[in-house]
Amino acid sequence: MRTVKSMLMAVGFVGVVAGALSLPVDAAGTTKVSGTRFEMTIPDCWTPGYKDIDEKLFMIFFKDPKSGAVLEGVYLRGAQPSTFKLADFKKARIAGEDKRYEGKGHKVSKDGTIAIAGENGDYLHTTWKDGGKDMEKHTALYLKDGNRYLVVMSGEKGKVDKKVFDEAVKSFALAKP
């Protein structure tokens, strides 16, 4: 039953994304996709998908059919207390990624601030090896009222178009209630 529910939800989401892709194009070759939590601009013709993991996260993702790079918009469920700051979010993200890529040479090659949703967020560029390939990931972290959001783009090093990530981050906005 759970599998059927997940499949139906996936089909519904793809329909929503496909419908969203028919909206007017923002910049040349891009479309703004809006959801219940956030909106961002994505490249046209990238393959959509989503993950909805019960009480953990909601993610929409788009895969470049040419390079295999993946662009993700993520909402992590569960509001954090007011004492939880952006620095805590960044520290937790790095620790989680270190664990995820353990034994693969995962490292933060660059970190700093980035403008996201009209406010300051944190930026991470990380690298690791996977199956003999050099991989990279660009991550923008955003914390608003205890809610955690990420824009992530990852793929094989040298095949990830950072301009796509930059446009998604620049256009990222919380959904209007």
Regions found by a protein language model. Name each.
Residues R37, W46, G112, T127-D130, ...:
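Short, well-ordered turn and helix-capping elements at secondary-structure junctions
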Residues G19-A27:
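Sec/Tat signal peptide C-region and signal peptidase I cleavage site
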Residues R37, F84-K91, K159-D166:
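Soluble non-cytosolic domains of exported or imported proteins
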Residues M1-F13, G19:
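Bacterial N-terminal signal peptides that target proteins for export
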Residues A27-L57:
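N-terminal "mature-domain start" segment
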Residues E39, T139-A140:
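Short, surface-exposed charged micro-motifs
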Residues D52-H138, K144, Y149:
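Conserved polar/disulfide-associated segments of primarily extracytoplasmic proteins
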Residues D44-W46, G146-P177:
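Surface-exposed amphipathic alpha-helical segments
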